[in-house]
Each structure stands twice: as C-alpha cells, then as structure tokens.
C-alpha cells in the first residue's frame, strides 16, 4: 500500500547520515551496474504480505569461543543470514508482497576505526571496513534475489542502527540505485531512523530501538505516520537493539522486539 513519511527536526547525526547518503547517490547515479532481473513466481497470493525481520546481524564482529563461549565472524555471519532466508522462504506462503525488514546494526562498525559511532567504544572486529561493507552489500542483494523468487514485489527497509548510523544510509542509497530499474523492488530511503509500510488495513512500523524504548514507541509512530496509522485497523511495530525477544500489546499497537542471529561479543559476555 501507499505510505508517507513525516519529516520533523533532523538531529545532527541524522543530518550527517543524510549528507553521506546524498554524496553516495550522486557519485553512483548513472554509473552503477543495475540488478539483473529475476523471473517472477508463477502464482502468488494477493491478500498476503510476508515480513522477514532481520536485526543486529553485526557483520564484521569478532567473537571467539574462548572468550565469549560462542563464535561469530564475517564469513559465518554471511552464511548464517543466507541460510536463515533460505529456510524462511521454504516455510512461508508465496505472498504477492513481502518486506525485507533489516532493523539496524547489519554492520558492526561505522568507519575505518572499529568503534561505536557515538561514544567511540572499542569493538572487536575480524575484518576491515571495506570488506565488511562489501559483504553487507552482497548479503542484502542476495536476500532480495532470493525473495524475488518467492514473491512478486519486495519492499526493502535498511534501518539505521547505533553501530552503523552513517553506513546504513549509504547502503540504502546504493541498493535503491541498484534496483531503480527493477519495478518489483522498492527501497525505503528515509533518513529519519523511523520507517513505515502499509498493506491493506495493516500498518507496519520499524525502528532499531536505540532512540526510543519499546514501551514508548507507539505514540512516536502514530504521530510520525499519521495517515498510515489513522487509516489502518491493525498496527505492528518491530524493533531490535537489545538482542532478545519481547512482545507487548499497547493501546496503540503490538510492539515486538526481535532477537539477533549473531553471537555475543566480549562486552555482552
């Protein structure tokens, strides 16, 4: 369905991310190889929309069993994410519409230095920034390609996270340009950190969870996306950030916090 973004005051972090996104888009415009078309499925169910939530993948993170009890790295992250999508597609209906809801922190760090963007806390990384970005782009393109074999239309949300505030903007712009000639793919290019999608009388909202807590997110979405919220009967909010599952019903919408596929890092352990 149709959806509209309500842009309010942009804080300095959001403004910097949008500036980076504009730079990437201008640099790539007209020169980026476009996606090769994927044959659409023979038959799909028009009344259904399938949402595939992925959050806190932390591609580029290093986790060693000796220190954390679990293992994670760039190669393992890519393999795990692609297996997750393959298994998910086998279990879902062939709906006409689908949403790839990547809810933030796809990448573990946001610059040449492996530190958190805001507080500059050191992070355990197993690769350099360029390789991490390359793998992240390959993963997103791979997920979309798989989804196009099952669903006729795919809407892509690549949410800002607290680990990849700026790079997530570059990812959105890159993927949008890459698929601009593919009418079966749409990309949410909002730079606010809050995202919405409408299917029939259902509104779906997405935010990483680093700026607004789950208990407080309902009014934020309802006010930012007045038309979507006001013209749908059921609303669902999807968040990540805290790496574990929590589902709450509020007076405004159902709020679900999704778990991570990634292992713990040294800080969490």
Spell out what each predicted region is.
Residues 34-39, 43, 121-203:
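Extended active-site neighborhood of metal-dependent phosphoesterases/phosphodiesterases
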Residues 85-95, 104, 147-151, 180-183:
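Alpha-helix termini
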Residues 53-64, 68, 94-132, 153-166, ...:
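Active-site neighborhood of divalent metal-dependent phosphoester/pyrophosphate hydrolases
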Residues 148, 174-193, 198-269:
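Conserved beta-sheet core of the metallophosphoesterase superfamily
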Residues 65-95, 137-145:
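Divalent metal-dependent phosphoesterase catalytic cores across multiple superfamilies
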Residues 49, 98, 234:
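Alpha/beta-hydrolase fold active-site loops
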Residues 1-75, 93-94:
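Acidic, histidine-bearing metal-coordination/catalytic regions of metal-dependent phosphoesterases
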Residues 31-42, 84, 217-228:
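Short, motif-level signal for alpha-helix interfacial/capping segments enriched in acidic residues
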């Amino acid at each position: 369905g149709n959806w509209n973004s309500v842009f309010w005051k942009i804080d300095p972090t959001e403004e910097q991310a949008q500036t980076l996104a504009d730079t990437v888009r201008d640099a790539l415009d007209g020169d980026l190889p476009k996606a090769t078309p994927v044959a659409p499925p023979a038959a799909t169910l028009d009344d259904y929309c399938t949402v595939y939530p992925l959050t806190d993948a932390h591609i580029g993170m290093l986790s060693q069993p000796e220190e954390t009890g679990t293992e994670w790295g760039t190669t393992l992250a890519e393999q795990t994410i692609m297996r997750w999508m393959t298994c998910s597609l086998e279990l879902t209906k062939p709906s006409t519409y689908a949403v790839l809801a990547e809810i933030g922190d796809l990448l573990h760090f946001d610059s040449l230095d492996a530190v958190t963007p805001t507080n500059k806390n050191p992070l355990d990384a197993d690769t350099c920034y360029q390789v991490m970005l390359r793998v992240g782009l390959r993963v997103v393109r791979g997920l979309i390609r798989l989804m196009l074999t099952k669903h006729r239309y795919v809407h892509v949300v690549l949410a800002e996270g607290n680990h990849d505030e700026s790079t997530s903007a570059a990812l959105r712009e890159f993927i949008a340009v890459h698929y601009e000639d593919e009418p079966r793919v749409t990309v949410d290019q909002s730079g606010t950190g809050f995202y919405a999608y409408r299917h029939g009388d259902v509104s779906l909202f997405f935010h990483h969870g680093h700026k607004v807590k789950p208990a407080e997110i309902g009014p934020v979405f309802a006010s930012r996306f007045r038309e979507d919220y006001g013209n749908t009967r059921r609303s669902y909010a999807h968040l990540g950030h805290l790496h574990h599952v929590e589902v709450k019903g509020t007076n405004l919408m159902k709020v679900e916090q999704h778990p991570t596929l990634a292992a713990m890092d040294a800080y969490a352990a």
